[in-house]
From Swiss-Prot:
The keyword Methyltransferase does not apply. Its EC number is 2.1.2.11. 3-methyl-2-oxobutanoate binds at residues 45-46, 84, 114. Pathway: Cofactor biosynthesis; (R)-pantothenate biosynthesis; (R)-pantoate from 3-methyl-2-oxobutanoate: step 1/2. It comes from the Bacteria. It comes from Synechococcus sp. (strain JA-2-3B'a(2-13)). Pfam families: Pantoate_transf. This is 3-methyl-2-oxobutanoate hydroxymethyltransferase. One of its GO terms (biological process) is pantothenate biosynthetic process.
Length: 261
């Protein structure tokens, strides 16, 4: 099966075909998602919380991201693979962003990178990367790396000035060359307006049904997270299933029925 290219995303938007994106941070999960036909797999900095036990995405380093992205790459044949640039690996200056993104593409084999924010300096950075051959997935609305400045994981764009700022950020990121945008935790009406205004696809996460596609953290979808964000949906409860399987194994061992005699 042919690997998806950057052109797939604009073509999907033009055809009205919803895009599906999920996160992965290990080989097995990546392989399963890829075989299920997911369009985009994101090695998200959320792995700092889901896989490494941190309370936010901020502690994640570029070396840790490289380690996980390399594992994911080995499991992906078809999906378009994007990795987050961790906090403070791209905000200092655009040359820093180029070095970080370049390492992820060169050493981990990702197809593109995701950057948070749409303020002027970040738009300039996006353009700088795109001009040098690096596909960029933009991310506006709730940007978790800025949680302290935002006052927590709060919905963004609820006021008229905030909504207008996000609309302008979306247009600016499109003009800078981003191939798609993540719209996170914003009013559905605003996300619908942005999705209609830009020519590139939008991937919603807590942004209503009018986006061109949806993205979720796979741990949330599988019921592995201890707490679900208000906009997520668990399609199964693997946390409970895993615990029950482990307890059943432990019981068999303690009762000396496994392995069978």
């Amino acid at each position: 099966m042919a690997a998806l290219s950057i052109h797939h995303f604009r073509q999907a938007k033009q055809a009205g075909q919803p895009l599906v994106a999920l996160t992965a941070a290990d080989y097995a999960t990546a392989q399963i998602l890829d075989q299920a036909g997911i369009d985009l797999i994101l090695v998200g900095d959320s792995l700092a919380m889901t896989h490494l036990g941190y309370t936010s995405t901020l502690p994640l380093t570029l070396e840790q991201m490289l380690h996980h992205a390399q594992a994911v790459r080995r499991g992906v044949e078809r999906a378009f693979l994007v990795a987050d640039l961790p906090f403070l690996t791209y905000q200092v200056h655009k040359e820093q962003a180029l070095l970080s993104a370049g390492r992820l593409m060169k050493e981990a084999g990702v197809n593109g990178v995701k950057l948070e924010g749409g303020y002027p300096d970040m738009v300039e950075t996006v353009a700088f990367l795109v001009q040098r051959g690096i596909p960029v997935l933009g991310h506006i609305g709730l940007t978790p790396q800025a949680k302290h400045q935002l006052g927590g994981y709060r919905q963004q764009g609820k006021t008229t000035p905030e909504a207008e700022r996000l609309r302008q950020e979306a247009l600016s990121l499109e003009q800078a060359g981003a191939f798609a945008l993540v719209l996170e935790h914003m009013p559905a009406e605003l996300a619908a307006q942005i999705s209609a205004q830009v020519g590139i696809p939008t991937l919603g996460i807590g942004a209503g049904p009018a986006c061109d596609g949806q993205i979720l953290v796979t741990h949330d979808l599988l019921g592995l997270s201890e707490r679900l964000p208000p906009f997520a949906k668990a399609y199964t409860n693997l946390r409970q299933a895993i615990r029950e399987a482990v307890e059943a194994f432990a019981d068999d061992v303690r009762q000396k029925v496994f392995p069978p005699r």
